[in-house]
């Protein structure tokens, strides 16, 4: 099972990494270019990779108008992947579309562009809804538990204070259920997009 964190890096990245290290869990992060450009966050970006986590791209702007209506999805993802490479030395190919691939990647043309750019896309199987549950870690934990039904789950979370509070309990739950934690690997990509496009 895969824990994933969107919208970093942030002032909470280091604290999330501390919890993951303490629990001996590797995770997958989808980071935003505008935040990656903040030099104050870059040490923790390097630390993320150093401690065995994967960093994929979550666009430069997180702006659905630009990404999906003005044709900037692939250019923004490439720019973000380049930033990740420049900071960490890794060469990731995985991206997560802001707001998910449905409806953003509905059009065949945008998906063709993604394939041409040799980019892979990941959505999620469990939405924790953490971003809108300020001061309510208990509900985040419940959301994750009640959606867990499959052998392989990909949990969508964000770098938020309430998520940090919920994280130890979420990890404990999965360990008790006998799940093994995985970290994304470009070599072992499996399809996980709401458009069910085998190419992505």
Language model regions located:
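Active-site beta->alpha N-cap acidic-glycine motif
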Residues: 1-68, 72-86, 173, 189
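Catalytic domains of cell-wall/extracellular-matrix polysaccharide-remodeling enzymes
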Residues: 62-187, 194-198
